[in-house]
Amino acid sequence: MCGNTMSVPLLTDAATVSGAERETAAVIFLHGLGDTGHSWADALSTIRLPHVKYICPHAPRIPVTLNMKMVMPSWFDLMGLSPDAPEDEAGIKKAAENIKALIEHEMKNGIPANRIVLGGFSQGGALSLYTALTCPHPLAGIVALSCWLPLHRAFPQAANGSAKDLAILQCHGELDPMVPVRFGALTAEKLRSVVTPARVQFKTYPGVMHSSCPQEMAAVKEFLEKLLPPV
């Protein structure tokens, strides 16, 4: 990893997948509640593009209200998983700032904002949506898997002006018992009020629960190939 990572705590021990060629683009992917970046680094290595660097940071360990205050990797506190559940606004905003610092570190190392995709699964996907929509830098797009938009009532007003050009791939399992697919559909509807509607893809997968599947990973690869072509 080139550059000073000490000022970006999430980078110091992040799981990374290096490109086989000169890296001209980056995907920052955020794991779900209770997980680490390693599992998604492994998954993304199966669809890697040779000129893309994949960065999968680990969330800090904090008490999570939803899980009886058990301490576990979590980007912010979770009180519930429904559109009207109370939210940890301060924690969400702080986590987003930490991800923006990671984005800016990559930019300083020569990867322009429009060659950076932010993505994530479940809570990580939620944070990637919030961060990208409020980011002052015009990113290439978002990969949002099995997730929702945090603080959704603040949008579209809370979005940065450059957010309207973001490309978004949103995927959801139709049998998801944790984050119901209906919540995903409401999120897609809200996203179309924030970005150019035609730039939001919402794909659902029959028989899939709160997890990924090969068809979804193929869709992610196709999305990244179009958004981050070789230069």
From Swiss-Prot:
Reported impact of C2A: Abolishes palmitoylation
Reaction catalyzed: S-hexadecanoyl-L-cysteinyl-[protein] + H2O = L-cysteinyl-[protein] + hexadecanoate + H(+); prostaglandin E2 1-glyceryl ester + H2O = prostaglandin E2 + glycerol + H(+); 1-hexadecanoyl-sn-glycero-3-phosphocholine + H2O = sn-glycerol 3-phosphocholine + hexadecanoate + H(+); 1-octadecanoyl-sn-glycero-3-phosphocholine + H2O = octadecanoate + sn-glycerol 3-phosphocholine + H(+)
EC number(s) given by UniProt: 3.1.2.-, 3.1.2.22
Consequence recorded when altering S122A: Abolishes ability to mediate depalmitoylation of ZDHHC6
Catalytic residues (UniProt): S122, D176, H210
Domain of life: Eukaryota
Cellular component terms (Gene Ontology): cytoplasm; cytosol; extracellular exosome; Golgi stack; nucleoplasm
GO molecular-function terms, A-Z: cadherin binding; carboxylic ester hydrolase activity; lysophospholipase activity; palmitoyl-(protein) hydrolase activity
Keyword Lipoprotein attributed: yes
Name this protein carries in UniProt: Acyl-protein thioesterase 2
Subcellular location: Cytoplasm
Organismal lineage: Eukaryota, Metazoa, Chordata, Craniata, Vertebrata
Family statement drawn from the similarity comment of this UniProt entry: Belongs to the AB hydrolase superfamily. AB hydrolase 2 family.
Tissue expression pattern: Expressed in various breast cancer cell lines.
Function: Acts as an acyl-protein thioesterase hydrolyzing fatty acids from S-acylated cysteine residues in proteins such as trimeric G alpha proteins, GSDMD, GAP43, ZDHHC6 or HRAS. Deacylates GAP43. Mediates depalmitoylation of ZDHHC6. Has lysophospholipase activity. Hydrolyzes prostaglandin glycerol esters (PG-Gs) in the following order prostaglandin D2-glycerol ester (PGD2-G) > prostaglandin E2 glycerol ester (PGE2-G) > prostaglandin F2-alpha-glycerol ester (PGF2-alpha-G). Hydrolyzes 1-arachidonoylglycerol but not 2-arachidonoylglycerol or arachidonoylethanolamide.
Keyword set includes Transmembrane: no
Transmembrane regions: none
Keywords assigned by UniProt, alphabetized: Cytoplasm, Fatty acid metabolism, Hydrolase, Lipid metabolism, Lipoprotein, Palmitate, Phosphoprotein
Covalent lipid sites (S-palmitoyl cysteine): C2
GO biological process: acylglycerol catabolic process; axon guidance; fatty acid metabolic process; prostaglandin catabolic process; protein depalmitoylation
